[in-house]
Amino acid sequence: MSTQSEAALEAGLIATLRQMDYDYVQIVEEDNLYANFKRQLEIHNRKRLEEHGRTGFAAEEFEKILIYLEGGTRFEKAKKLRDLYPLDTADGQRIWVEFLNRQQWCQNEFQVSNQITVEGRKKCRYDVTILVNGLPLVQIELKRRGVELKQAYNQIQRYHKTSFHGLFDYIQLFVISNGVNTRYFANNPNSGYKFTFTWTDAVNHPFNELDKFAVFFLEKCTLGKIIGKYIVLHEGDKCLMVLRPYQFYAVEKILDRVQNSNDNGYIWHTTGAGKTLTSFKAAQLVSELDDVDKVMFVVDRHDLDTQTQSEYEAFESGAVDSTDNTDELVKRLQSNSKIIITTIQKLNAAVSKTWYSSKIDAIRHSRIVMIFDECHRSHFGDSHKKIMKFFDNAQIFGFTGTPIFTENAVDGHTTKEIFGNCLHKYLIKDAIADENVLGFLVEYYHGNEIVDNDNQARMEEIARFILNNFNKSTFDGEFDALFAVQSVPMLIRYYKIFKSLNPKIRIGAVFTYAANNSQDDEQTGMGTGQYAKESVGEADELQ
C-alpha cells in the first residue's frame, strides 16, 4: 500500500471540494466560527431579511439566535436545525430564521475549512469541516494511508469527551478515511464502529477511496439531501440515524416512480437489511409530496401491524396513524391522516363490505400510495384484486427479501406480475460483504431422485442424514441449529421419524408464519382446524 501523509490527504480533499464549488473559509478559532456563521446565516436568510427592510442581524439579535441554538441536548439541537426560529426584534417585528433548507436542499450555503482549533477539556484541531449555512454539519477525520481506519473513529470518540461543544454539537455526520477506505456515520456517540457505512453506487459498488467518496457523497446537492431528508431523528433512543446507501437508493427509486409515473414496483432487500427504516422513510417522504393524498403501509398480520406502529413511533412520534380495527381504518381514511398503517385483512374488509366502502367512496379515486411490507402470495388472491379495483388510482410498492419468480411460482403468479419491475436490489451477498448479516457455510447433500417433499422415504433419508452427522455439525449436542419445514403436519411427521430413529434426541418446535405463505394458511396448517384437531396432542410432546 502506498503511503500518503495526512496533510497531503487533507490538501487533496480540500482541492476536490473547491473544484465542486465549495467555498473555502479559513477559521482558526471559535470566534472566527461565530463571525462566519453570522455572515452565512444572513446570506441564507437574505429574502426574509429584505422583507423586513434589513440586510443583516443586529448584534443583540444574533446573540438571541446563539442563545437559542446553544441550549438543549444534541438530539434537541438536531431538531432545532430543522425548525424555523421566530426572532422577535426590538422594533416589534418577527423574522422566521431558517438554519437549513430541507425542501430545496441545493439552496444552502456550502463551505469547507480545516484545522479549526477548539478549546474544551483539551485543545483540539479538527481535520476538515464542512459548514452548511455557517454551521459545522459534517466533520471529516483523516489518517495517513496505511493507518487502521478505526483510529480515526476512536479520535472522534475522544473529541466527544474532550472538545465538541457549542456549534459543533450541530454536527450531523462524520466521515473517516485513510485514503483507501472511507466510511460515514451519524453523530451518535453510543452507536459503535459497526454503524459506520461505506457509500456505494445504486448497484452496491463501494466508493472506498476518499476521492471517489467525495465526488459522489459530498457533492453539494447529494449531501444537502442526505442531511435534510435521510437522517432520522429516532425519538425512542433520542439519537440520530443515517440511512445506508441501499436504503437511500431504494427510497429515491420509489420517490422517482411516484413523481414521474403511475407504474408500480418492488424493492428486493435481503432479510436483516433494515426494511422497516427504509419503508418508514419512503412513506414519510412520499407523504410530503403535494399530489399524494394518502400513504398506506400495509402489513399481513395484526401483530406486525402493532410492531410496525411501535417502530414507526420510535422513528418519529406521531408520524403515522394506526388502525386497531376496520372501523378505525375507515375513520382514518376519511380524515386528514397522511400515513396510515393497517393490515391487508382490514383493508379488504373496508372495500368489500358495503357498510364500510360507502363511507370511503369519496376517496376511491384519490392519489393513494400503498407500501406493502412483504410482496408474498397473499397479494396473489382475491383480496388484493378487490383492493386494487376499489382504489383504482392507487400506486403500489412492495418490499421483499424473497421475491417470487417463474422458477419458484407455485401457482403461476410472480412478484413482477403483481408489483411491476424491481426498483432496487440489495441481496444477501451484498449484506454479507457489508457485514450487515452473518455469513454462512453451504453444504450440499444430494439424496435420491424423489422430489416429493411429503414422500416418507425421502423424509426418513433426510432424518438419517441429520442424525449421522449430528455430532460433527453441533456443539456437544446443544440447541444450535434449525431444521425448517414447510408445515405443522410435516413437523409432526418428522418428529415421529426422529423419535423412532433415536428416542433420546431432544426436539423443540417453533411455529411461525412463513414469509411467502398463502393468506388462508393452507400451506402451514395453522389457519384451519386441521392442526388443532389432529396435531395438538402430538405437538405438546415437543415442548
What are the residue ranges of the model-derived segments?
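Conserved RecA-like ASCE P-loop NTPase motor core of nucleic-acid helicases/translocases
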Residues: 268-269, 293-301, 479-487
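Conserved RecA-like helicase motor-core motifs
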Residues: 25-27, 266, 294-296, 309, ...
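Short, conserved secondary-structure transition motifs
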Residues: 173-185, 331, 486-489, 511-519
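Conserved C-terminal RecA-like helicase domain
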Residues: 338, 453-543
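Short secondary-structure boundary/capping segments
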Residues: 146, 154-158, 186-195, 282-283, ...
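ATP-dependent helicase/translocase motor core
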Residues: 2-294, 303-319, 335-339, 345, ...
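Signature of the SF2 helicase/ATPase Hel1-core->accessory helical subdomain module
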Residues: 149, 196, 345-451, 459
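Short glycine-/polar-rich loops that comprise or flank the Walker A/P-loop
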Residues: 135-137, 168-172, 291-293, 338, ...
